[in-house]
């Protein structure tokens, strides 16, 4: 179904593990293929003194490349994360937001009408609600 929806260029939003499944594979499940919808690898967040893994909590986003999900948001909005693995996208142009947690994390990507967020917009207060409204508008909704 995911391949069909993305092939038809219908707006599609993946969150957290859903984002990770869109790529080639993951350190979390070595030898298990991802869906290959987008190019990139899912890597374990590097251990760094003073940082806990899993990464649970609020981090600011660095917005880039004019992501449609982030239209109308202030610079460096805070969103909520819960993860131990992160995306390293093969194509930097699809990366629409990054955050820092031991390394640069590709926190959101957009390719055509496929959107994905490592963070949880549904747990990210008014910023998350704005992101979800922007996605609804892409589907013709009156968010």
What are these regions (language model features)?
Residues 4-7, 41-143:
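Amide-donor transfer/coupling interface in amidating biosynthetic enzymes
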Residues 1-56:
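Cysteine-nucleophile active-site neighborhood
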